[in-house]
Design a protein with these regions (language model features):
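Active-site-adjacent structural elements that line small-molecule/cofactor binding pockets in enzymes
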Residues: 1-321
């Protein structure tokens, strides 16, 4: 059984208040996109934009990409997932992952320990709770005593795992319904997807800078790369992908506290690999390479203000293909 090709978008959009997203979501549906995938870091939470979309756009599939396994209690997470399943029957998918030590530990004061087991345990708990079981269990990373959901759901939604390296990628295929990947090139997809297994959904957040101004691309792209690829989980990911030698000067400068030197150490061709940019046709062709290499659900994230993001949405619409 092959996984259908879908057309997602990352939401919410920078510079657009949540209450103003209705017309954006309605246009996204009209343009032929199939999915909205929310991000959660230092802005909106992952669920609220999707709850709004559930009411505003009854045709769109809604997914979190991703919810950290650490930052909500087990029961609270199950209740939130169940609420989304009821709000958008047959249209909700849960993306869950470790997140990073920055978000979990530095921002939320929670120990970032045993990430693989934490995600695995959370998936197992959610499957039991959403099935209506009364859960009492000593998991490896947390314990639950006597919890039963007070609302019924008619289905367990697809659960996808944010994954970078082989262990978590295999977990995504073994205990999840697929993987959510990001910060990788189109060619990197070929190294990642086989670890998940066959007939699994692969959602990719792909960063898109909708301009052919090379100077702007280098300026914005290098700063985005420096901000992410110095986070330990992403540094380890790119070392595994074979970029250790390329990125070592950036890592060394960052560790020394020289942010300017770290940014300057990023090669231009790495920006070209990790940030999709160019003319509308060049962007479309680059995004198509991700799909050709195994991504079933691209979810472009536009690194742009509202006007440029709206323009890019229209230029890259599935209805234009």
């Amino acid at each position: 059984m092959s996984v259908p090709q879908r057309h997602g978008i990352t939401v919410p959009f920078d510079g657009v208040p949540l209450h103003a997203h209705r017309e954006w979501f309605e246009e996204i549906a009209a343009l032929g996109y199939t999915d909205l995938w929310s991000a959660e870091s230092g802005g909106a939470d992952a669920f609220t934009p999707l709850a709004l979309a559930a009411a505003w756009t009854p045709s769109l599939r809604l997914g979190t990409a991703i919810v950290p396994a650490y930052t909500r209690g087990a029961a609270t997470l199950a209740e939130t997932v169940a609420s989304m399943v009821q709000a958008a029957p047959g249209r909700f998918a849960l993306g869950i992952g470790t997140s990073s030590n920055v978000i979990v530990e530095n921002w939320n004061g929670i120990k970032f320990e045993e990430p693989y087991r934490r995600v695995r345990d959370t998936i197992r708990f959610l499957r039991a709770a959403l099935a209506g079981e009364k859960v009492t269990n000593e998991y490896d990373t947390f314990a639950v005593k006597g919890f039963r959901l007070g609302i019924r759901v008619d289905e367990i939604p697809p659960i996808l795992v944010a994954a970078l390296r082989p262990g978590m990628l295999r977990l995504a295929g073994r205990e999840g319904d697929g993987a959510i990947i990001n910060w990788l090139s189109a060619d990197d997809v070929k190294s990642v997807v086989p670890h998940v297994g066959e007939d699994k959904e692969i959602v990719a957040r792909i960063f898109v800078l909708p301009t052919d101004n090379d100077e702007a691309v280098r300026f914005i792209g290098k700063r985005a790369i420096a901000a992410y690829l110095n986070v330990p989980v992403y540094a380890a990911f790119h070392a595994w992908l074979g970029r250790g030698e390329t990125l070592q000067p950036m890592w060394d400068a960052w560790k020394a506290g020289d942010r300017e030197a770290a940014t300057a150490a990023i090669p231009d061709d790495l920006v070209d690999d990790l940030i999709v940019h160019g003319t509308p046709n060049e962007i479309r062709e680059h995004l198509a390479r991700y799909a050709a290499n195994g991504v079933t659900t691209p979810a472009p994230a536009f690194l742009a203000g509202p006007d440029d993001a709206r323009r890019a949405l229209r230029e890259q619409a599935p209805s234009n293909a």
